[in-house]
Amino acid sequence: MIGFSNVMKALINYDKPITLHNNITKITIPSNSYNNDMSHLNMRGFPALEELIIGSNCFGGVNSLILNEMNGIESIVIGESSLFNTSSIMLVDLPLLDHVEMREDALYGGGSNSSLMLVNLPSLRRINSNGNSLVELRNLIVISDW
């Protein structure tokens, strides 16, 4: 099986533009994945992506999460204890994003300067936070052009 990080590297580093990412409508990250692979996760430019599901206990080493320029995304689900140590979360220019669900201990927080930035999310109706999600959040920044 090709790992998610290898697919991302292939999409980003290929000499000629690849349009595979233009047709992906759903990404599901299996539980217990990518805990030591990266310190920053920046996902952008998946124009057809409608749903992002991150399983439980994923991306344990990620300090910052940026989701941006995904014009079709409607739903983000972050599984239990995923992105546990993340201190910076940015959701930017996601015009159709309707809701974000964070399960128990997801995005717990990465210390005294943890921040959540929401920029240009005109369709956002709800953020569900279960249990200890966002428990160490210190800064909430909302910027809107709508």
Give residue ranges: language-model regions.
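Feature marks extracellular polysaccharide-active and adherence modules
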Residues: 30, 55, 68, 79, ...
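Acidic/polar low-complexity surface segments
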Residues: 102-115
